[in-house]
């Protein structure tokens, strides 16, 4: 028997390429042959993504819209009184009426109201004038009192100065007489000694 030759396979992919009938790896025929076997549908994924979202997401959207649509009322609309505020009766706005407008039916009542307001204002002005006059009188009285005190102090100072001068004059005359008498007697020198002060 003759020895049979075996073909050595150098490349694993060589047998595949040999089956296709071409030696080139990335040929079009190879890709066609592989794709011819199985066909996949890609339309299903596209329809799912383009279609409507599932039901649980819809419910979530509805809840979000309900929360957004809820109206928030202000304190004014709810009629809550504002705290820490003292509002006079005239300033407070009654519901359904205009603030600060009082309509009078007859002219006489309007004139009486006007007269009352004017009298009140005049009284306030008069009281201010009276107060100003009183303050002026008080100021004048204080001024007069201050001047009187100053004059008294000046008179007192003048009196004290006069007394001191008189005492000095009297004291000087007495000393002069004593010096003259002693000079005649000879016990003391004619000129009196001057006082000297020495500082250390």
UniProtKB/Swiss-Prot annotation:
This is 60S ribosomal subunit assembly/export protein loc1. GO terms for cellular component: nucleolus; preribosome, large subunit precursor. GO terms for biological process: intracellular mRNA localization; mRNA transport; ribosomal large subunit biogenesis. Residues 1-73, 138-200 are annotated as: Disordered. The gene is loc1. Disulfide bonds: none annotated. Residues 190-200 have a biased composition (Basic residues). Belongs to the LOC1 family. Residues 138-180 have a biased composition (Basic and acidic residues). It is found in: Nucleus, Nucleolus. The keyword Nuclease does not apply. Keywords: Coiled coil, mRNA transport, Nucleus, Ribosome biogenesis, Transport. GO terms for molecular function: mRNA binding. Residues 1-12, 23-38 have a biased composition (Polar residues). Required for efficient assembly and nuclear export of the 60S ribosomal subunit. Component of the 66S pre-ribosomal particle. Residues 130-170 form a coiled coil.
């Amino acid at each position: 028997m003759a020895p049979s030759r075996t073909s050595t396979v150098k490349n694993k992919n060589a047998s595949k390429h040999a089956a296709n009938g071409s030696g080139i790896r990335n040929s079009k025929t190879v890709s066609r042959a592989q794709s011819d076997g199985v066909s996949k549908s890609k339309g299903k994924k596209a329809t799912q993504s383009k279609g409507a979202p599932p039901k649980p997401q819809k419910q979530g959207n509805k809840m979000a819209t309900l929360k957004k649509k809820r109206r928030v009322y202000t304190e004014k609309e709810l009629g809550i009184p504002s705290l820490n505020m003292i509002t006079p009766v005239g300033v407070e706005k009654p519901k359904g009426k205009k603030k600060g407008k009082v309509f009078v039916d007859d002219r006489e009542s309007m004139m009486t109201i006007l007269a009352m307001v004017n009298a009140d204002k005049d009284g306030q002005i008069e009281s201010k004038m009276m107060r100003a006059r009183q303050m002026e009188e008080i100021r004048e009285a204080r001024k007069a009192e201050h001047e009187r005190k100053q004059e008294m102090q000046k008179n007192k100072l003048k009196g004290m100065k006069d007394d001191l001068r008189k005492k000095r004059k009297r004291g000087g005359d007495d000393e002069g007489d004593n010096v003259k008498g002693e000079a005649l007697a000879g016990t003391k020198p004619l000129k009196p000694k001057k006082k000297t002060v020495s500082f250390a």
